Structure formats: structure tokens, C-alpha cells
Amino acid sequence: MILAGDIGGTKTAIALFDDSADELRLVRDGTFPSKDHGSLEEILARFLQGHEGPSLRAGCFGVAGAVIEGKCQTTNLPWHLEEEALARAIGAAHVRLLNDL
């Protein structure tokens, strides 16, 4: 399973994909008002609540802000994101943050 997201100042869109076949299959997705939450970890916990499928292998999140050595201070939210902390939060071996340009 792969978790992907677009982290914006207004909304955060999250999607969970099954990667066990040749093509990715959307399992579920959701959108959350970013400013109603104190952190991305809070949103991810809410999104994953009740998930009983296979464990997550990886996560990837597009963010507004420079990503330096796996860390990002978002430009339009008071959030500090770190790949390692996010990986621990979702129980995945790998997480990447990407600047969304």
C-alpha cells in the first residue's frame, strides 16, 4: 500500500493506493481543511483510522515549501514536516516530501 498526498494551505488531499498488482488501484481518498488540523500527522491518523488492510510500504507528499534533507517548513501553514517522523507516524519504511512547485 502507498499513501500519497497534496498538502496545501487550504486543503490536504490524501489517497491510499494498493500496489500489489501491475497497476496502482485507488483504495480510498479524502480531503481535509488543512487549517483545521495542527499537523499533517493528525490528518494522516484521521485518514488511516480503521484501516485494516495490508501495511503501508511508502508515502509521498507534495508540499508548498523547500524540502531540504527530508525536512520542510511549509510556506502557508505553521507545519514543520520531516520524512522520518512521517514514516514513523504511518508505519511505513519510506516517506518522501516533494516540493509541489
Language model segments and positions:
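Short glycine- and Lys/Arg-enriched binding-loop motifs that mark or flank ligand-binding interfaces
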Residues: 1-5, 58-61
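Short glycine-rich, Thr/Ser-proximal phosphate-binding strand/loop in the N-terminal lobe
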Residues: 2-46
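Short beta-strand-loop/turn "lid" adjacent to the catalytic site in phosphate-handling enzymes
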Residues: 51-97, 101
